[in-house]
Amino acid sequence: MFIIKSMLYRLMQMIVVLFVISTLTFILMKLSPGNPVDKILHLDVAQVSTEQINATKDKLGLNDSLLVQWWHWMNHLLHFNLGKSFESKEPVTQILFNYAPITLLISFSTLVVSLCISIPLGIIAAKRFHKWTDKVIRVISTLSISLPAFFIGIILLFIVTNLMNIDSVILSQFILPVITLSLGMCAYIIRLVRSNLLMLLQSNIVQASRLRGMNERYILIHDLLKPTILPIIPLLGISLGSLIGGTVVIENLFDIPGIGYLLMDSIKSRDYPVIQGCVLFIGFFVVIINTIADLLTLLLDPKQRLQLGNPKIKTNTPLISESSDRHA
């Protein structure tokens, strides 16, 4: 019952967030400098008659008041109609379907690679606390967090194209972007796994298992793995949402025909429907992914369900920031 209430609450929250995103995007597009009519006519304003400009504006509905334009936009949105591109005249939904797969592929591949690398490294760092292995992993994690993704991408491009003289579409448009995005994501997960595991190694349940003669491998798999990984789920939701939104820079850097590339191209041409569609796509996936992450945490963590059923109950689950500061 509490889970159903939580799902309904998240659904209402998602609707409100998407409404705010769509409205803010509409307002920002109307306040931004430039005129899409100039781009559509592909002519200098001095060479186009006023009648042609007004006819084009009437056709696009740009002569209506802002309130009327907003109402038409929201009405179409409720019917899952994002309009047509000013440039290509294609439906925006079709354009998004053409560009979205590569963005989603890179984002989810980055997530898988990050998990496969960061969880083992976080466990190794915790098990070898304050040894040279732990110190090396911490230094690499700190560097990965400190360096911007676009800077890492530029370095990788320079190494592959200039120093190694490798010309491969798969390498430049898939493997390198995944590596670039994975480095920063791995760093956060490694630090979280390490700090959670260090804290759990001092818990009573671990001490009791050791007294019963259980080996360290058994303790890690049966006693520590689930409580270590559970706090990662909310972070994964935030990180994956950020990945989809953050591909704008990476896709333009590596010349990848994804949503980020489409968004930048549409901004240059003042293609309002496509811009609004891209922003809504990114916002929708960010909200959906975070909602799924919250529900998974609720389903897998009994403490969260207990606290949801009785808000007066306070769980003893430590905050991520506190545990990170304690074992950093």
UniProtKB/Swiss-Prot annotation:
SUPFAM superfamilies hit by this protein: MetI-like (SSF161098)
Subcellular location as annotated: Cell membrane
Domain of life of the source: Bacteria
Disruption phenotype: Deletion of the nikBCDE operon strongly reduces nickel transport and urease activity. Mutant shows decreased virulence in a mouse model of ascending UTI.
Family according to the record: Belongs to the binding-protein-dependent transport system permease family. OppBC subfamily.
Transmembrane segment boundaries: 11-31, 104-124, 139-159, 170-190, 229-249, 279-299
GO cellular component term of the entry, any: plasma membrane
Function description: Part of the ABC transporter complex NikABCDE (Opp2) involved in nickel import. Probably responsible for the translocation of the substrate across the membrane. Required for full urease activity and plays a significant role in the virulence of S.aureus during urinary tract infection (UTI).
Listed InterPro entries: BPD_transp_1_N, MetI-like, MetI-like_sf, Opp2B
Keyword Transport found: yes
Domain ABC transmembrane type-1: 100-297
Gene: nikB
Topology of the protein relative to the lipid bilayer: Multi-pass membrane protein
Primary localization: membrane
Record's keyword terms, sorted: Cell membrane, Ion transport, Membrane, Nickel, Nickel transport, Transmembrane, Transmembrane helix, Transport
Keyword Membrane listed: yes
PROSITE patterns to which the protein is assigned, alphabetical: ABC_TM1
Protein name (database record): Nickel import system permease protein NikB
Pfam family, one: BPD_transp_1
GO MF terms held by the record: nickel cation transmembrane transporter activity; transmembrane transporter activity
